Amino acid sequence: MESEMSDPQPLQEERYDMSGARLALTLCVTKAREGSEVDMEALERMFRYLKFESTMKRDPTAQQFLEELDEFQQTIDNWEEPVSCAFVVLMAHGEEGLLKGEDEKMVRLEDLFEVLNNKNCKALRGKPKVYIIQACRGEHRDPGEELRGNEELGGDEELGGDEVAVLKNNPQSIPTYTDTLHIYSTVEGYLSYRHDEKGSGFIQTLTDVFIHKKGSILELTEEITRLMANTEVMQEGKPRKVNPEVQSTLRKKLYLQ
């Protein structure tokens, strides 16, 4: 006997309150990174259009990456009015999990992400924190694969494992790492690309979409991924493909406009 099942119910849309201050910090290594100034100009236009209080710092050393994030955290916690959202843009040469400072030394991305989490930044508890990372994450190059006919990429996910968890509703507390969005210029293990005169395709596409399109930020990142997946980068005379990677622990819809 088949059990009766009710019709699926649409999700209730819950949005982050964006009526408070919006703060942004951009840390960019321009040394040996031609085209990065063009990216910074595009980001400044975007933040101005989206009504962010924006701070931009050039050529931080590895240690200064951490120091600037610490100072940004203190600025947020001491802001006179409620803060709704924070953006952090990190642009540098990189490897898997690492960024290279102006002094050629490395800083761990995880150490940078720790600074604004729900434990360390009280003013941003339960508030969206968006990281945009324009950097290589390895040495692999993606030549791309051809789609056949109406073939689309997709797959099924399974939830499994040996752990047993007891769940109970406790809205009075939240995990340390919620309300965070990481937008990487490329997938883990792969190179990121930048044009000497036009800047990076990632930053230029992102700023264009964030200014000219409306939707939740996750919908906007889907559009950025679609646009970048449809373009080709020439490197050493060979066509390459690149697409962003998005990691989200957002609990609500984030709308910038």
UniProtKB/Swiss-Prot annotation:
What are the recorded GO MF terms, alphabetically? Answer: cysteine-type endopeptidase activity; peptidase activity
UniProt propeptide residues: 156-167
Q: Which Gene3D superfamilies match?
A: 3.40.50.1460
Q: Alphabetically list the UniProt keywords.
A: Cytoplasm, Differentiation, Hydrolase, Nucleus, Protease, Thiol protease, Zymogen
User: Effect of knocking it out?
Assistant: Mice show a shiny and lichenified skin with an epidermis containing more alveolar keratohyalin F-granules and an altered profilaggrin processing. The skin is highly sensitive to the formation of cyclobutane pyrimidine dimers after UVB irradiation, leading to increased levels of UVB-induced apoptosis. Mice accumulate incomplete filaggrin breakdown products within the epidermal stratum corneum (SC), leading to reduced levels of natural moisturizing factors (NMFs) and lower SC hydration.
Enzyme's top EC category:
hydrolase
Q: Which InterPro entries match?
A: Caspase-like_dom_sf, Caspase_cys_AS, Pept_C14, Pept_C14_caspase, Pept_C14_p10, Pept_C14_p20, Pept_C14A
Q: List, alphabetically, the SUPFAM superfamilies matched.
A: Caspase-like
Q: Which residues form the active site?
A: H93, C136
Q: Which domain of life is it from?
A: Eukaryota
Q: Which terms in the GO cellular component ontology are assigned?
A: cornified envelope; cytosol; keratin filament; mitochondrion; nucleoplasm
Q: Family assignment?
A: Belongs to the peptidase C14A family.
What functional role does this protein have? Non-apoptotic caspase which is involved in epidermal differentiation. Seems to play a role in keratinocyte differentiation and is required for cornification. Regulates maturation of the epidermis by proteolytically processing filaggrin. In vitro is equally active on the synthetic caspase substrates WEHD-ACF and IETD-AFC. Involved in processing of prosaposin in the epidermis. May be involved in retinal pigment epithelium cell barrier function.
Q: What name does UniProt use for this protein?
A: Caspase-14
